[in-house]
Amino acid sequence: MALAAKLLPSIVAFVALACCVLRSSVASVDHHRKLSGWSIGGATWYGPANGSGTDGGACGYQGDVGQPPFNSMIAAGSPSIYESGKGCGSCYQVKCSGNPSCSGKPVTVVLTDLCPGGACLEEPVHFDLSGTAFGAMAKPGQDDQLRNAGKLPVQYARVPCKWQGVDIAFRVDAGSNQYYLAVLVEDEDGDGDLSAVDLMQSGGSGGGGSWAAMQQSWGAVWKYNSGPAPLQAPMSIRLTSGSGRTLVASNVIPAGWQPGGTYRSIVNFRRED
């Protein structure tokens, strides 16, 4: 009993330490989703000085990156925030203060690409911004001077996407056919990213009336193989955001759909204040 009494304080201290480690591990999983303030990262830029990085990128948005609502304000993220494509569509505020040309004011960018090596691996979180986005961090008239710096330390924060007046769009991949459907999902409000996508066909022998999980193909592209039975349109798509919110785009893929076609829904996640 005396030995147990002596060991008790050590046991209590060990349990307390273990709990702290566990809480730290759990917190790190949600680090980029529930940022409570500014964190430190790095930034470079790529593509034309006043451009949108490169067309396409590892998320699959192609030329849309230069159009509304992206408007060239995009970033290629380090693997830690690209998350094998699950980070596609997420929004961040980024600001710099380590250069005389920095305005110190945050700009909002959306993740549309992967920066897999080089400077993007020199710190835990790195943004390879479009030339437009990098220059937007500058004081008025000093965007070229800021871009000449090449690389800068930045502060960043995960923020909700605010695509006002824009509903979610589904672009059917050119390789889709009557047995295989792949869609690029874009313009999600709020979280911006997705953790799951499901498909419901219309009636018939192809699984109509029930939800079937789609698989992430790459980036923001999700796919479904219907097996021996052809796909039955119209088809509905259910989206689950990174934080677990769900949304259904009913009959968004119409009868007579075409590979390469873009079908815009009438729904979107609405930002939670």
UniProtKB/Swiss-Prot annotation:
Glycosylation sites: N50
Keywords recorded for this protein, A-Z: Cell wall, Cell wall biogenesis/degradation, Disulfide bond, Glycoprotein, Membrane, Secreted, Signal
Subcellular location: Secreted, Cell wall; Membrane
Coiled coil keyword on record: no
Cellular compartments per GO CC: extracellular region; membrane
Stored InterPro entries: Expan_Lol_pI, Expansin/allergen_DPBB_dom, Expansin_CBD, Expansin_CBD_sf, LolPI, RlpA-like_DPBB, RlpA-like_sf
GO biological process entries: plant-type cell wall loosening; sexual reproduction
Gene3D superfamilies: Expansin, cellulose-binding-like domain, RlpA-like domain
Membrane topology note: Peripheral membrane protein
Signal peptide residues on this chain, from the entry's feature table: 1-27
One Pfam family from the record: DPBB_1
Domain Expansin-like EG45 span(s) in chain numbering: 56-166
Domain Expansin-like CBD span(s) in chain numbering: 179-265
Disulfide bridge map: C59-C88, C91-C161, C96-C102
Stated family: Belongs to the expansin family. Expansin B subfamily.
Function: May cause loosening and extension of plant cell walls by disrupting non-covalent bonding between cellulose microfibrils and matrix glucans. No enzymatic activity has been found. May be required for rapid internodal elongation in deepwater rice during submergence.
Protein name: Putative expansin-B14
Biological source species: Oryza sativa subsp. japonica (Rice)
Gene it is expressed from: EXPB14
